[in-house]
Design a protein with these regions (language model features):
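Short, charged/polar surface micro-motifs in flexible loops or helix N-caps
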Residues: 34-37, 45-50, 68, 114
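Short, conserved beta-strand element in jelly-roll/cupin
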Residues: 44-45, 55-71
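Conserved short histidine dyad/triad with adjacent acidic residue
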Residues: 39-56, 90-91
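Ligand-binding loop in jelly-roll beta-barrel domains
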Residues: 90-115
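A short, N-terminal "cap"/entry segment at the start of jelly-roll beta-barrel domains
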Residues: 1-39
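Short hydrophobic/aromatic-rich beta-strand segments that constitute the beta-sheet cores
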Residues: 52, 71, 106-108
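Short strand-coil-strand connectors
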Residues: 72-76, 101
Length: 115
């Protein structure tokens, strides 16, 4: 078969080192290993210092699954809730801060691969 299925029971996020005061877990579910030109996965953000991601080399689309997240960029913030979709364009110097007061979980697709 040409498609690649990852059963829900096989998807487990793992901690990503994002600094001592931040906590973020994620897993790339589909990426180069499956021959994809993009990276797709699940990310969980926990309370703590905001997590910053640069978008110098990739763009992202994220679909909120659970909880709430706040995205901040250049002093502006946006709240994300379940069902919301956000597009973050690829742009040199673009830095987006992700944070939550409780918990937030989302599905992401980056193009090209973010790692």
């Amino acid at each position: 078969m040409e498609f690649h299925l990852v059963p829900a029971g096989e998807i487990e996020t793992e901690p990503l080192d994002v600094g001592p005061d931040s906590k973020l877990n994620l897993v790339d579910v589909i990426d180069r290993a499956q021959g994809a030109p993009f990276c797709a996965g699940i990310c969980e953000v926990f309370p703590g210092a905001p997590v910053d991601f640069d978008y110098d080399d990739d763009a992202a689309v994220c679909y909120m699954l659970e909880g709430e997240l706040t995205l901040a960029e250049d002093g502006e913030t946006r709240a994300l809730r379940p069902g919301d979709v956000v597009y973050v364009p690829r742009r040199k110097g673009l830095l987006v801060y992700w944070s939550t007061d409780s918990y937030g979980k989302f599905f992401y697709v980056t193009y090209p691969h973010w790692r």
